[in-house]
Amino acid sequence: MNWKLRLQERLWGLAPWDAQRISDEWFRAHFEYAADVVHNWIGSVLDVRTAQLLNFGCGDGITDLALVLRHGATAIHGVDIRREYAKLPRIAREQLGMARIPAGMTFETITPGAPLAGRRPLVDGIMSWSTFEHVQRDQLAPIFSDLHACLRPGGYFFIQIEPLFYSPFGSHLRRYDEVPWHHLLVSEGELWKVIEAHQGPIDAMETDFGFADFGVDGYKKFVFNEYRALNRLT
């Protein structure tokens, strides 16, 4: 199927898109800010127009899409333990009016801790955005070693971790709790009561495309479980 898309793009170019259509703030933040930060770093050492890139923890793939559309990347393989990227064709259609996502983007669901090295050609650059705080401590060294083995000699690895656990909002729960360092000041049970009692909308920039899958109460439980699973090291 991918070769058909590549042929289409060779003949007619990328599908038309229009950033003026963007209405979702989560999309805007990752399509603009996150992509610009990644490109500022990766683009300073690699030519993204020719580089083979791997995104470890690609999420919904919005940042990858922006790197292709706004910065000229031509080959990005995204991997994640969840399948949020499967929503990208719909998201791109709704937010950009795109009929199809670029052929240079590929995605894969992986098992936590499963090695990637040796399964695909070596890459020029690896990027990871807000992922490693979710990796369990005993998996950190093996995963870093595995990713290093995925890089060509002289390749580059861009890693972003935010927020850091011991920072004011390191719980990743700011969408529900605006008290700085609250996760370090109260018990887990007390913190959950704050999250559970929250009423009203949450910041649009913090409302990802998985929210609708869970519903209001289900999403609270999901993000709180994500907080509980943080490695508390990064």
Where do the protein language model's features map onto the residues?
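Conserved class I S-adenosyl-L-methionine
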Residues: 50-59, 158-201
